[in-house]
Each structure stands twice: as structure tokens, then as C-alpha cells.
């Protein structure tokens, strides 16, 4: 069995003295692991960093085996990204979200989305908006999508500013006014006709509160999980008031202890 594909490095762990098990999110083969001979050495260190894009060749005697990867770096963005304070948290959180997908189950649209996110990840506000949208997309991919296209109470498609915490449906300003304190806020950048250009820190907090509630209830808690420290760190980093000074750059831990 063998195939070639493009992939994004999600994680790496040492295997034996000199090899490493590498986890990729691939375009056509989903989230897939493989053994890289020499992967624990310094030669491949620049390539085997979370967030990098690679071209992968995989082979195994049987399809169900772990198999072996031959990897070639395509877009080695990790070093540049990790000079940005929020990026280490963001890449770690992206990888954790990708691991919610079943192993070896193709999700080409999610792969393309992660590629686009990583290419536009240096700006904190845009990175925050991208991650909220990715969490929303992940809910949909896992079968728990939110209907933000029309008011759940009246069917109108305009002035949607709330979301029901029970149904996950959008609610218009007029219909939601009597229960505004019990509804989640739908930030402008999640509405179909809006972009993230004017997104504020409060908008990002509202977005993460929205997606976080449904991820926790529908996906994480049934698996015995909760929100990660990386997610919390990322939200703090991208919503931090500029007047408070810069956060220190957080490095990704070296999975092979080098």
C-alpha cells in the first residue's frame, strides 16, 4: 500500500533512538500517522514542526499498519509564526481541533481551511476570527452545525444578533430582546454579509463563547474532555488590550525533548 499527498504537521513524538511518529492532516487521506526514520535527528527538525506544510509519501505492507512516511518540506512557516506571541497557542489549539476528526477519514475542506488560516495567522485579530470560524466549521463537520442563516423564532434573515444556547439557531434582535440576557451574542464577523476587518476584542470573546459552548456540550464533554489551556491562552493573547504591552513569545514544547 502506498500513496502521496500534501499534509500539515499536527504533532511529532520520538519513537526509539532516531525515529519519530508524525501526525499529519492530509488533503485526501485525513488525519494520518506514520513513522519517519531519522525523524528525531537535527536534519529533519526544521521540517517536523507543527504548522509546516509538507509533501508526504506513505507506504505500508497493509493499509491498517502505521506505515512509513517520506516527507519533503513545502511551506516551512513554523519558525516565522512562532515569533508571534499568539501563534504557539493557536497552532496547538488548531492541532487539538483537528484531532477531533476521525483518523484516516478524508476532510479535504478542513485541510484547505487550515492551510488558509496558517497563511494569514500573523495578525492577532484575523487569527482570532479564523479560529472562531474554524471551531464553527468543526461543529458542522462533526454533525453539530449551528443554523445562523435565519431567526429560529420568526424565520427572518436580517438583524440576527443572538444565538439560542439550546437549539444553536440564530435569533433576531426583535425576537430575542425579551430574553437577551439568556441568549448568546452572534458577533458581526460570523454573519454572512460581514467580514473580520472591523472585528473587536469583544467580538472575538463573544465568538469563542458561542462556539466554545457547543463544542464543550456536544463534542468535548461526551469524550470526557474540556477546553484546553492552549485555547484559553490563545483567546487571552488575541483579545489582550494593546496598551498592556506585548505578551512574551511562547515556544512550542519540543516533542522529542531536544
Swiss-Prot record:
GO biological process per UniProt: DNA recombination; double-strand break repair
InterPro entries, alphabetized: ARFGAP/RecO, DNA_rep/recomb_RecO_N, NA-bd_OB-fold, RecO, RecO_C
Keyword set includes DNA damage: yes
Keywords: DNA damage, DNA recombination, DNA repair
Pfam families listed in its UniProt record: RecO_C (PF02565), RecO_N (PF11967)
Function as written in the Swiss-Prot or TrEMBL entry: Involved in DNA repair and RecF pathway recombination.
Protein name per the record: DNA repair protein RecO
Organism of derivation: Rhodopseudomonas palustris (strain BisA53)
Organism placement in taxonomy: Bacteria, Pseudomonadati, Pseudomonadota, Alphaproteobacteria, Hyphomicrobiales
Amino acid at each position: 500500500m502506498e500513496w502521496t499527498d500534501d499534509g500539515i504537521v499536527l504533532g511529532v513524538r520520538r519513537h526509539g533512538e532516531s525515529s519519530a511518529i508524525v501526525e499529519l492532516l492530509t488533503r485526501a487521506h485525513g488525519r494520518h500517522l506514520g513513522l519517519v526514520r531519522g525523524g528525531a535527528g537535527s536534519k529533519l527538525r526544521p521540517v517536523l514542526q507543527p504548522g509546516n506544510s509538507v509533501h508526504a509519501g506513505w507506504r505500508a505492507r497493509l493499509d491498517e499498519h502505521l506505515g512509513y512516511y517520506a516527507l519533503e518540506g513545502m511551506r516551512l512557516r513554523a519558525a516565522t509564526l512562532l515569533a508571534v506571541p499568539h501563534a504557539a497557542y493557536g497552532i496547538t489549539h488548531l492541532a487539538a481541533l483537528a484531532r477531533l476528526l476521525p483518523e484516516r477519514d478524508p476532510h479535504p475542506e478542513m485541510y484547505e481551511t487550515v492551510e488558509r488560516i496558517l497563511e494569514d495567522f500573523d495578525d492577532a485579530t484575523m487569527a482570532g476570527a479564523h479560529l472562531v470560524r474554524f471551531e464553527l466549521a468543526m461543529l458542522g463537520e462533526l454533525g453539530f452545525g449551528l443554523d445562523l442563516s435565519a431567526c429560529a423564532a420568526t424565520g427572518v434573515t436580517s438583524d440576527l444578533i443572538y444565538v439560542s444556547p439550546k437549539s444553536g439557531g440564530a435569533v433576531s434582535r426583535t425576537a430575542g430582546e425579551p430574553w437577551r440576557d439568556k441568549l448568546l451574542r452572534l458577533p458581526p464577523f460570523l454573519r454572512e454579509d460581514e467580514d473580520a476587518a472591523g472585528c473587536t476584542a469583544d467580538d472575538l470573546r463573544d465568538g469563542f463563547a458561542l462556539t466554545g459552548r457547543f463544542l464543550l456540550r456536544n463534542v468535548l464533554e461526551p469524550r470526557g474532555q474540556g477546553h484546553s489551556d492552549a485555547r484559553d491562552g490563545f483567546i487571552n493573547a488575541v483579545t489582550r488590550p494593546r496598551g498592556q504591552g506585548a505578551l512574551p513569545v511562547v515556544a512550542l514544547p519540543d516533542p522529542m525533548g531536544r
